[in-house]
Structures are given as structure tokens and as C-alpha cells.
Amino acid sequence: MKKRDKIVYWVATIWLSLGMVSTGIVQLLQLEEQVQKMSALGYPSYFYTIIGIWKILGVIAILLPKLPLVKEWAYAGFFFLMSGAIFTHLAVADEASEYFGPALLLVLTILSWHFRPANRKIQLSKLEKTA
């Protein structure tokens, strides 16, 4: 792995982790302002708890060594969650500033996934042996 790729991976992964953990904590705390925003988007308040837990568990999966299959699920979850957030903001015609957070986390998800080291990827040879 090139040094540049390793740097891109860790910068993207650290920022992604900070973003997901911080928003996950806010969602678990269900602060009034955030609950109102979520309600305006058409989501029930209990949805916040589910998303907050998923975000924090996803960050743990991405940062822990090994568990490549769980990492793939976490990256997929982050991708679906952030792309869904972007489309939700589009559907309710929110201001452009509302797209920035989800779009940034989506880009960081893609960068972290793309530049992850080989030991954090699923090895196809292992999958083929079990099939």
C-alpha cells in the first residue's frame, strides 16, 4: 500500500468516525432541536435511537482490526444512511446548507472504503474456499 493511500485512508476514516460518533451521540440524546428537524423530515423520534446506535456500532466495526465482513456491512450502512439523508433533504426541498453534512460523510465513507488496507478487506480466496 502506498504511503499516500494510507494517509488518505486514515484521514478519511478518522473524520468519518468523528462525524458518525458525534452525530450518533446527538441522535441518542434526542436533543429538542434535532428531534424537531427529524419530525419535519417525516421521521418518528424513535428512528433517532436506531440510527444513533447503528452509527456508533459502525464506527467500532470500521476501527477494529480484522472483521472484514462486518466492516463491509458498516460501510454499506453508512453509504445507505447518508445517501438516504441527502435524498430526504431533497424531498422536502431543504436549503443547500442541509446537504453539506450528509454529503461530506458520504464522500468520507467512499474514500475510507476505497483506500482501506488489504488486511481490512474481504479476501476473495477465503470466500471461495467456503463456497
Task: Name each model feature, range by range.
Residues M1-A131:
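Membrane-interface extramembranous regions
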